[in-house]
Amino acid sequence: MSISLGNAFIKNFLGKAPDWYKIAIISFLIINPLVFFFVDPFAAGWLLVVEFIFTLAMALKCYPLQPGGLLAIQAIAIGMTSAEQVKHELVANIEVLLLLVFMVAGIYFMKQLLLFIFTKILIGIKSKTALSVAFCFTAAFLSAFLDALTVIAVVISVAVGFYAIYHRVASGQGGTPSHDHTCDSNVTDELSRDDLENYRAFLRSLLMHAGVGTALGGVMTMVGEPQNLIIADQANWMFGEFIIRMLPVTAPVFICGLLTCVVVEKLGICGYGAKLPENVRNILEEYESEERKNRTNIDNAKLIIQSVIAVWLIVALAMHLAAVGLIGLSVIILATAFTGVIEEHAMGKAFEEALPFTALLAVFFAIVAVIIDQELFKPIIDAVLAVEDKSSQLALFYVANGILSMVSDNVFVGTVYINEVKTALLDGVITRDQFDLLAVAINTGTNLPSVATPNGQAAFLFLLTSALAPLIQLSYGRMVWMALPYTIVLALVGLFGISFLLEPMTTMFYDFGWITHGTIEAATNAVSSGH
């Protein structure tokens, strides 16, 4: 049936997004200029922020780049901010953009090593509880040095591989290379179907443990999450100092996070507790044994090279030898040069995962520019900063960041809050020591409670929108339900750390000489976003 040209334009607008979503975005684009010019620019600014958060919350209906980008372009066009201010934000946060472009691509060329590690873990550990802790801990360790998105990408590729191996055998097509593991129609044996359902539940729980692990590790270092880099840059902290300043909160949270992993597996609550079926284990062990036999010296040489590059990566990051993105670029060069990847099309695949998110981050910064120009957060920040009790001030910042990060993206929230606190410091409203404590509250507030929903953590959203999610029946609701015990524990232990441990332990670190008191001059010299 032919379609009219007018209907074709409507159908093409935001593609397969539901009609109600398209109408909502068009309504936003009509309402915003009217409110800005005829009601109040401040109200229009807040309306834009709410609309942008809506596009993030509806990320499964439509990737937020397109609707969020349209809102951002209109905001610049009608004068809510300027293209120059957006450029200023991008330049100020160039390290984050470099991280996303080069580091994620760099790790792509080390996938063989990471796949090898996770394969050994999955096959080698018989206890489900121990395996869950191992996945959570390994994901946390890797996320402390690498990007959480990359770690989740690796875990997903491992899980898809293992799922496909068993599905092929269960479908009676063990030797078929072109087997479609997304179709269950050939899995007719009831025993195989039961095993498949249990295996799906097993993989779901492992992926959620790994996902939370990326949050546990990601909060600890300045390279763990994109907003950490922004906060470290504004505070003028180096790699080591960032870790030490976060320890009063991150250490108890990490321990309690791993304990939560054990408890949910032992009790079998919130969708956890599924064990690896024996039939599946036998099939996977046979596969791993076959792979080991077929591994050539070429493959071994690649694994050795990638191991050496991994050591270089950790040392370079720990010693802050260059901007994180540039270290990522060095990984791309070393990994491709020494493993023989020299064709342009082979290299291009490495950049596919990160670039859409990098573009979305640029749109975030356009919204941040509006928030700065319209001074949207000023009343809230002023109210929190006006609280005389410093401990209450820290707790309020943590809670405010946490709640916003559950519904919005934590990069966006962290950027906005650190900008406002930096302004307060430069205006003499707070001391440099209080600024440092607030920076810790902002960093932990954006990283820990945000595990509640896929909207908050980019790694969770990446998992939810991956090809694996429908295979193992991981829906939005199921993800929120499985994250619930972690959300409660991480948020409350984080709040306890902010309220009772942060100030005394930071004072102790000063006394030990592990960190030194910062100066306002140092913060002024750091690249200042939005000023």
From Swiss-Prot:
Pfam families reported in the protein's UniProt record: NhaB
Localization terms from the record: Cell inner membrane
Keyword Protein biosynthesis attached: no
GO MF term set: sodium:proton antiporter activity
InterPro entries xrefs: Na+/H+_antiporter_NhaB
Catalytic activity: 2 Na(+)(in) + 3 H(+)(out) = 2 Na(+)(out) + 3 H(+)(in)
Keywords, comma-separated and alphabetical: Antiport, Cell inner membrane, Cell membrane, Ion transport, Membrane, Sodium, Sodium transport, Transmembrane, Transmembrane helix, Transport
Family in the record: Belongs to the NhaB Na(+)/H(+) (TC 2.A.34) antiporter family.
Described purpose of this protein according to its UniProt entry: Na(+)/H(+) antiporter that extrudes sodium in exchange for external protons.
Name the record gives this protein: Na(+)/H(+) antiporter NhaB
